A protein has these predicted regions:
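Short glycine-rich anion-binding loops that position phosphate/pyrophosphate groups of nucleotides
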Residues: 16-17, 87-91, 167-169, 228-230
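Short active-site oxyanion
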Residues: 30-36, 108-112, 160-161
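A contiguous loop/helix-start segment that scaffolds small-molecule binding in enzyme catalytic cores
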Residues: 6, 160, 167-284
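Glycine-centered tight-turn and secondary-structure capping sites
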Residues: 96-98, 260
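Class I SAM-dependent methyltransferase SAM-binding "motif I" and its flanking Rossmann-like core
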Residues: 99-157
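Loop/turn-to-beta-strand initiation segments
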Residues: 8-9, 78-83, 159-160
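Glycine-rich, flexible N-terminal cofactor/catalytic loop recognition
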Residues: 1-63
Length: 284
């Protein structure tokens, strides 16, 4: 373990289901630190007992994350090393973590992250959907206004979308996504990742609603949804411009104070034709 004037905060990823997914480095760190801060000590004690780890433990969760962060920082100022763990996965990824990390940096406390399990990445890599660019939304917001705002943003999202959902809200969320993104949008539904009853389903949003009419949702879900096609967006945008008369299209830009020459250039680009074609059409 690295030596610093203060202690260090170690972000330790824990298994999302299969205990064999824990890393040697995380196990060593959990044994060597002075204290483990756990999202739910009742859950984490089972993990530590399984690996015969006797390190003292304290709670760090959503409802004490600020006050407790400063208490833990005080201990690290005294030279204590602390490991942060959650019920499953990587701290800070849809779990407590980001606030204490920010506070540690503000207070000059070193932070390091030990790589490991994360349900979002596990699901994405085996989804069969594009992995180069993705948008991780975690659980959709509970606040109604914010919830709707996120759905509206997803309408034009071209990256692969990752959403977490609980079984009792799954059908409602699939219906909202269907209504927002369209029934033909493809997705991969991952359930109970790394566990005995792990399941992956590839289908459209429309098919997913039919499927869950006869299959009761069980377990925790990760939804991997295809982003919107750029080609499709371009075609829709072009169709929108073409629905305007040429004069209306020109007026759209000229009303913004754009001179006629530049307006013709933009209209030509919008319609996928040459500036000369626009000029000649306007002369008729």
């Amino acid at each position: 373990m690295e030596q610093h004037k203060t202690g260090t905060l170690y972000l330790c990823a824990t298994p999302i289901g299969n205990l064999e997914d824990i890393t040697y480095r995380v196990l060593r760190t959990l044994k060597e630190v002075d204290l483990s801060a756990a999202e739910d000590t009742r859950n984490s004690i089972r993990l530590l007992n399984h690996f015969e780890i006797k390190t003292p433990m304290t709670s760090y969760h959503e409802y004490n994350k600020i006050d407790k962060a400063y208490q833990l920082v005080a201990k690290m100022r005294e030279g204590k090393n602390i490991a942060l763990i959650t019920d499953a996965g990587t701290p800070g990824i849809s779990d407590p973590g980001e606030d204490i990390v920010r506070i540690c940096y503000e207070e000059g406390i070193p932070v390091t992250s030990l790589p490991g399990a994360a349900a979002c990445i596990t699901a994405l890599t085996m989804s069969g959907l594009p992995t180069r660019r993705f948008a991780f939304e975690a659980f959709l917001p509970k606040d109604k206004k914010e919830h709707q705002a996120v759905l509206e943003e997803l309408k034009t999202e071209t990256r692969t979308i990752i959403i977490y959902e609980a079984p009792h809200h799954l059908v409602r969320t699939l219906q909202e996504l269907h209504d927002t993104l369209g029934g033909d949008r493809r997705l991969t539904i991952c359930r109970e990742l790394t566990k005995r009853h792990e399941e992956k389903l590839q289908m459209t949003l429309a098919d997913s609603l039919s499927y869950y009419e006869v299959n009761e949702p069980r377990g925790e879900y990760v939804l991997i949804i295809a982003g919107r096609s750029r080609e499709e967006m371009k075609k829709e945008e072009q169709a929108g411009w073409e629905a305007l008369s040429l004069e209306e299209h020109m007026a759209h830009y000229e009303s913004q104070g754009i001179d006629r020459k530049e307006a013709m250039k933009r209209v030509a680009k919008d319609r996928g034709v040459s500036k000369r074609d626009i000029y000649q059409a306007l002369l008729k």
